[in-house]
């Protein structure tokens, strides 16, 4: 019994201890565990909701993606159709362009071929015509007949007078031309009784005055000023030149500076002109005018054919003694004393002009002194005496003055004549007519 009571008390103590010290922690642990389980259940429920929402969003995104894909496909299909339509339109346009361009190219090639055929045919025709003409004029009578036909045509021109400018004064204005005529008239008066030697000295003195005007430009400017005080300038010339040149030369210079000139260079030209006249008058006094004219024209033709020689003689920047020495060697014994003096004076007094032009002008001046015009005639062969006479007579009627013929032979002319009088050219050669026909061929 006592054992039972002891055990009961022990059991009660154990129960007390359990209730007092074990049950509260256990209860708290259970409560905490329950809270944890509850929270986990809530979190699980929340997660499940999120998963459900995610599934819904995924499904929605999938639907949207499918819709976008369908839209992209539709847009791509529409763009493809538009691009295909544009490409078809471009292809049609390109085909049309190539077609039109091809037609234009064919037309161009056709026209070009036609032009080439026409040109070739025209060239061949002209070449054949040239051969026929050359064969025809190889006979002297036929070639002479072409000259006669040209003279017949020229004869028809004779009633219409041609205005021929004075070769000497053509480069001047009217005032200077009148002054030059007055100076030449005064020169003729002063040299009426001067002998050949005096004329030679006069030419040298006037050439020296011309060189003085070049080396003393201030003096030349004062003498050439277009003023009314001609007497004052003449007195100045006398003061400067008296005792240094002859009285005749001084009077010529005074007459020159007393005139009114349009330009200062005209006075220089006038003095050089009188220097040439002195030697030409000397040729007249010595009855060698024709010889001098012929020699001048022959030398002029040499310069025309030798451009390098003309260039050397024209180069006034080189020493004049060297150029005159070259001139003397060229002339040798083929020219008279007067011709040599005229050519040397011309070369010495060049002012930038070409030697060939200056010599040609000198030769024409020699002819003009006799009241004639110079006709430079080019022919394929020598003219007969009758043709020369008729040509001179026809030109004399056209220009109102006797004509001096200067004939140049050029076989390439084939036939007919080419005549140059001053600046007027009458071209009646067969070669020029064939050339004209060739230039008129279609391009």
Swiss-Prot record:
It holds the Pfam family OSCP. The chain crosses the membrane at residues 4-24. One of its GO terms (molecular function) is proton-transporting ATP synthase activity, rotational mechanism. Keywords: ATP synthesis, Cell membrane, CF(0), Hydrogen ion transport, Ion transport, Membrane, Multifunctional enzyme, Transmembrane, Transmembrane helix, Transport. Its main location: membrane. Residues 169-443 are annotated as: ATP synthase subunit delta. Residues 1-168 are annotated as: ATP synthase subunit b. It is a single-pass membrane protein. CDD domains: ATP-synt_Fo_b (cd06503). The keyword Transport applies. It is found in: Cell membrane. Coiled coil: none annotated. One of its GO terms (cellular component) is proton-transporting ATP synthase complex. In the N-terminal section; belongs to the ATPase B chain family. In the C-terminal section; belongs to the ATPase delta chain family. F(1)F(0) ATP synthase produces ATP from ADP in the presence of a proton or sodium gradient. F-type ATPases consist of two structural domains, F(1) containing the extramembraneous catalytic core and F(0) containing the membrane proton channel, linked together by a central stalk and a peripheral stalk. During catalysis, ATP synthesis in the catalytic domain of F(1) is coupled via a rotary mechanism of the central stalk subunits to proton translocation. F-type ATPases have 2 components, F(1) - the catalytic core - and F(0) - the membrane proton channel. F(1) has five subunits: alpha(3), beta(3), gamma(1), delta(1), epsilon(1). F(0) has three main subunits: a(1), b(2) and c(10-14). The alpha and beta chains form an alternating ring which encloses part of the gamma chain. F(1) is attached to F(0) by a central stalk formed by the gamma and epsilon chains, while a peripheral stalk is formed by the delta and b chains. HAMAP family: ATP_synth_b_bprime, ATP_synth_delta_bact. This is ATP synthase subunit b-delta. It comes from Mycobacterium sp. (strain KMS).
